[in-house]
């Protein structure tokens, strides 16, 4: 056979394997997606404004002035907001987990416990649903991302921030965020970021970072990888952490005839989607546009599987000093009674009940003593009256004797 004949052989038609991504796209587009994000941080850091700006719609209403004047909550609450968003015929079920009351008290000891319990409960609930015979419709509220809002003090992280992030980072994808970054100058912001990164590294707090291996880094530098732009984008996101954000839901004219979402000050505008002003666009890319599936898959393959493995192996809580992962030995249904904050309230209620019982017992003893004293007084009065009656009877007898003598 000649070389010309060999090269002229017909190329077989494709079998259709390359069409698999299109099939997958169709399935995902029909099923839609679910994304659950937890907002953690002190009150007044713009969490509600940020989430509304992120999805460009009003998912949560801001607390009114009347609500802000209510007494400070003694415990951390869990507030769940659900919404169905649609963009280009694709539906995304969004669950926003807010944590009002976190960090608002003078004593914030164990303030992170309700957050940790909630994340563990969702893992446990999903695991129990997987063990059921019929699993066609599973309710999934597992947290895919935790946005931890840091107050822009310019100094560093507070102990409650460090402890809470350490606890959350072993259970969910933790993303630290510097709130209200426009209150710091550019130099102060960079120094603040550097301090936070140093503390995160020293405390071995695991934060979510875009996947970036060593080979990808080299390819990005040389430009040999066709995905080098994506790798470079991931590197920029990593360098920008913790993200400095500014929140606003109002639009203003930027002086060029364009309406932009911004915060207006006497000296000018702080544009939300301007990379030179804040990191909002980078955080949005991490959460939605570029790495949403990575957040979901990491939750499933790492955090949930870790919880499931430890639960099935019967591991118990290894103590406060374990920095890897601590799994409560008790069932989630009984966690409430073992929560340290509820323990404090339980002890306070027991003390109050004991004090009330003692007060009532003291009151009854005093009442009994008063009755005894009254009985003694009445007996004395009765004896006195009986004595008077006896004397009167003797006098009557004496008079009767005298009367008989006179007759």
From Swiss-Prot:
Which keywords label this protein? Answer: Acetylation, Cell cycle, Cell division, Coiled coil, GTP-binding, Membrane, Nucleotide-binding
Q: Which residues form a coiled coil?
A: 344-406
Q: Which InterPro entries match?
A: G_SEPTIN_dom (IPR030379), P-loop_NTPase (IPR027417), Septin (IPR016491)
A Pfam family name for this chain? Answer: Septin
Q: Show which residues constitute the signal peptide.
A: none
Q: Determine the domain of life of the protein's source.
A: Eukaryota
Q: List every stretch annotated G1 motif.
A: 41-48
Q: Does the keyword Acetylation apply?
A: yes
Instruction: List, for all copies, the residue spans of the domain called Septin-type G.
Output: 31-314
GO terms of biological process kind: cellular bud neck septin ring organization; cytoskeleton-dependent cytokinesis; maintenance of cell polarity; mitotic actomyosin contractile ring assembly; mitotic cytokinesis; protein localization; septin ring assembly; septum digestion after cytokinesis
> Would you name any one GO CC term?
septin ring
Region called G3 motif, residue ranges: 98-101
> Per its record, what are the GO molecular function terms?
GTP binding; GTPase activity; molecular adaptor activity; phosphatidylinositol-4-phosphate binding; phosphatidylinositol-5-phosphate binding; structural constituent of cytoskeleton
Compartments reported by the entry: Membrane; Bud neck
Q: How does it sit in the membrane?
A: Peripheral membrane protein
Annotated region G4 motif: where?
179-182
In this chain, GTP is annotated as bound at 41-48, 75, 101, 180-188, 247, 263
Task: Kindly give any further remark recorded in the entry.
Answer: Present with 1170 molecules/cell in log phase SD medium.
**Subunit details:** Component of the septin complex which consists of CDC3, CDC10, CDC11, CDC12 and probably SHS1 and rearranges to a cortical collar of highly ordered filaments at the mother-bud-neck. A complex formed by CDC3, CDC10, CDC11 and CDC12 is capable of forming long filaments in vitro and the components seem to be present in a 2:2:2:2 arrangement in vivo. The filaments are proposed to be formed by the end-to-end polymerization of CDC3-CDC12-CDC11 complexes with CDC10 serving as a bridge to bundle the polymers into paired filaments.
- Its job: Septins are GTPases involved in cytokinesis that assemble early in the cell cycle as a patch at the incipient bud site and form a ring approximate 15 minutes before bud emergence, which transforms into an hour-glass shaped collar of cortical filaments that spans both sides of the mother-bud neck. This collar persists until just before cytokinesis, when it splits into two rings that occupy opposite sides of the neck. The septins at the bud neck serve as a structural scaffold that recruits different components involved in diverse processes at specific stages during the cell cycle.
Similarity remark: Belongs to the TRAFAC class TrmE-Era-EngA-EngB-Septin-like GTPase superfamily. Septin GTPase family.
Q: What is this protein called?
A: Cell division control protein 12
């Amino acid at each position: 056979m000649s070389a010309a004949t060999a090269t002229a052989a017909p190329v077989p038609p494709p079998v259709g394997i390359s069409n698999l991504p299109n099939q997958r796209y169709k399935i995902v587009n029909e099923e839609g997606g679910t994304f659950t994000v937890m907002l953690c941080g002190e009150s007044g850091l713009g969490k509600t404004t940020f989430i509304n700006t992120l999805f460009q719609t009003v998912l949560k209403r801001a607390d009114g002035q009347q609500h802000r004047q209510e007494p400070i909550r003694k415990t951390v609450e869990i507030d769940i907001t659900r919404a169905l968003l649609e963009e280009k015929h694709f539906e995304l079920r969004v669950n926003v987990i807010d944590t009002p009351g976190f960090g608002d008290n003078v004593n914030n000891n164990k303030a992170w416990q309700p957050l940790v319990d909630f994340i563990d409960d969702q893992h446990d609930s999903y695991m129990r649903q997987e063990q059921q015979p019929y699993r066609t419709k599973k309710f999934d509220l597992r947290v895919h991302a935790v946005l931890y809002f840091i107050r822009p003090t310019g100094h560093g992280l507070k102990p409650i921030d460090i402890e809470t992030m350490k606890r959350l980072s072993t259970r969910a994808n933790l993303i630290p965020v510097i709130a209200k970054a426009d209150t710091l100058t550019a130099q102060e912001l960079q120094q603040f970021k550097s301090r936070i990164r140093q503390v995160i590294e020293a405390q071995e707090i695991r934060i979510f970072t875009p996947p970036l291996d060593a080979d990808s880094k080299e390819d990005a530098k040389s430009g040999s990888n066709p995905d080098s732009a994506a790798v470079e984008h991931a590197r920029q996101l990593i360098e920008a952490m913790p993200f400095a954000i500014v929140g606003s839901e109002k639009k203003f004219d930027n002086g060029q005839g364009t309406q932009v979402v911004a915060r207006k000050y006497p000296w000018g505008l702080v544009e939300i989607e301007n990379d030179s002003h804040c990191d909002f666009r980078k955080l949005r890319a991490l959460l939605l546009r570029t790495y949403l599936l990575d957040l979901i898959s990491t939750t499933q393959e790492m955090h949930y599987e870790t919880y499931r493995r430890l639960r099935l192996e019967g591991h118990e809580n290894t103590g406060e000093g374990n920095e890897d992962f601590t799994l409560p030995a008790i069932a989630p249904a009984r966690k409430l009674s073992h929560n340290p904050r509820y323990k404090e309230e339980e002890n306070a209620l027991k003390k109050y009940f004991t004090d009330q019982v003692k007060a009532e017992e003291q009151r009854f003893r005093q009442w009994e003593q008063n009755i005894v004293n009254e009985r003694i007084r009445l007996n004395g009065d009765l004896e006195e009256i009986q004595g008077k009656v006896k004397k009167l009877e003797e006098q009557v007898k004496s008079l009767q004797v005298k009367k008989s003598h006179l007759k």
